[in-house]
Amino acid sequence: VIKSGEKLSYKLGTRGSPLSLAQTNWVLDELKKTNSSLKFDIEKITTKGDTDTRPLFEMEQKGIFEKEIDRAVSEKRVDFAVHSMKDVPSTLDSSLTIACVPKRESANDVLITNEGFSLDSIPSGSTVGSSSLRRAVQISRKRPDLNVKPIRGNIETRINKVIEKKIDGIVLAKAGISRLGVDTKHSILSKDEFLPSPGQGALAIICRNDDSKTIEMLKKIEDKNS
């Protein structure tokens, strides 16, 4: 039943990477389960993190994957945005709010190799790629005999470097391969031994804090446990 004055058409902003689009489409599918009349228009927005090819730890990381998208929300060019929670800064623009955190994926990191090695069993001298300083430090601390190399690119690009044997392994978030439906040999890294990034595996849906209709619509897929 459509309520009088109910808003049914929304525009949202997201990065154009395969993972960002997969996350966004998952959110839209969940929202449509709450109301099949909802219609969404996706606007792909390029961020600084998409165009700067330096290793992430050489960049000023605050807002590199979300600032341009949040600006579009704030300026009312889009109604809401879907982010990885770990990319959201601790302080948002005063006009914005995290309207919803839907069901969270695993927070663990994984090691991907062609052989399915664990971090304990991967041979000494192997080269392991990581886009994150946090992961690089933890790999080196646990296995100082490995060569840790900065690696950029979307998840498929990084995995292909392993398949093509340009690198022996990569460490990335399990949530990424789960959301993309990527079937690849991997070893799950224990959170006790390999601390994930705060908010890893969770999504944050951002909208304007005075947009009560959008907030009400988004709250329907809030997962309190996440």
Q: Which sequence ranges carry the predicted segments?
A:
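Short, well-ordered beta-strand segments
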Residues: 11-13, 81, 99, 129, ...
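Glycine/Thr-rich phosphate-binding loops of Rossmann-like dinucleotide-binding domains
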Residues: 91, 138, 180
